[in-house]
């Protein structure tokens, strides 16, 4: 039958270089992606290389809390 909690959860990935540059006001915004992860296979925070339209390059996007 059904388990207690859903295994797949929605996570938000945020550009780490835009967050650092936001202190200097160099970037126009912060790039964010919404994706899913399996809670059992990936219990730690997710980090992926994604394209950032504000930095104009591929950067590390890390998981943030909702």
UniProtKB/Swiss-Prot annotation:
This is Large ribosomal subunit protein bL33c. GO terms for molecular function: structural constituent of ribosome. Keywords: Chloroplast, Plastid, Ribonucleoprotein, Ribosomal protein. It is found in: Plastid, Chloroplast. Coiled coil: none annotated. GO terms for cellular component: chloroplast; ribonucleoprotein complex; ribosome. One of its GO terms (biological process) is translation. InterPro entries: Ribosomal_bL33, Ribosomal_bL33_CS, Ribosomal_bL33_sf, Ribosomal_zn-bd. The keyword Plastid applies. It comes from the Eukaryota. PROSITE patterns: RIBOSOMAL_L33 (PS00582). Belongs to the bacterial ribosomal protein bL33 family.
